Each structure stands twice: as structure tokens, then as C-alpha cells.
UniProtKB/Swiss-Prot annotation:
Residues 4-24 form the ELK domain. The keyword Hydrolase does not apply. The gene is KNOX1. This is Homeobox protein knotted-1-like 1. SUPFAM superfamilies: Homeodomain-like. The keyword Cytoplasm does not apply. It comes from Zea mays. GO terms for molecular function: DNA binding. One of its GO terms (biological process) is regulation of DNA-templated transcription. Highly expressed in the roots. SMART domains: HOX.
């Protein structure tokens, strides 16, 4: 009986451990945007380098073109301006 209980517990936790492992891996990958989407954003950035603040319409188009969420677009531009834009 004890051996059966041990085996039962092991089987139950095994699937949960696998679920947690997959979730961790998925969250790690979440940090970087796909290259094809960043190339679209970078192209917009280069075309508007003097004033890289997209309008709401610009953002809506970028959401449509990239498939990213509006928050991701906003964060990308915030980070890009902090890292790469020097307003003269």
C-alpha cells in the first residue's frame, strides 16, 4: 500500500512539475520580440528619427502590421528612445 501511494504521488507531481517547467521556459522567451516585428518598428523609427513619437494612428497601424499588443509597441518606443535617441 505504501509503495502504491508513493507511486501515485510521484505520477501526480510529475505532470505538475512538467507544467511548471514549461511555464518557466515560456516566460523566459517572453523577453524578446520576434525579429520580423522589430524590423517593422525599426523602420518606422528610422523614418521618424527626428521626432520618434508615433501618433495613436501610427501605433494602431503598427499593432496591425506586427501583431503586437499596444502596450508592447509603447514599451518598445519608450525603451528605444531611452537607449538610442539623443534630441539635439
Amino acid at each position: 500500500v505504501r509503495q502504491e501511494l508513493k507511486l501515485e504521488l510521484k505520477q501526480g507531481f510529475k505532470s505538475r512539475i512538467e507544467d511548471v517547467r514549461e511555464e518557466i521556459l515560456r516566460k523566459r522567451r517572453a523577453g524578446k520580440l520576434p525579429g520580423d516585428t522589430t524590423s517593422i518598428l525599426k523602420q518606422w523609427w528610422q523614418e521618424h528619427s527626428k521626432w520618434p513619437y508615433p501618433t495613436e494612428d501610427d501605433k494602431a497601424k503598427l499593432v496591425e502590421e506586427t501583431g503586437l499588443q499596444l502596450k508592447q509597441i509603447n514599451n518598445w518606443f519608450i525603451n528605444q528612445r531611452k537607449r538610442n535617441w539623443h534630441n539635439n
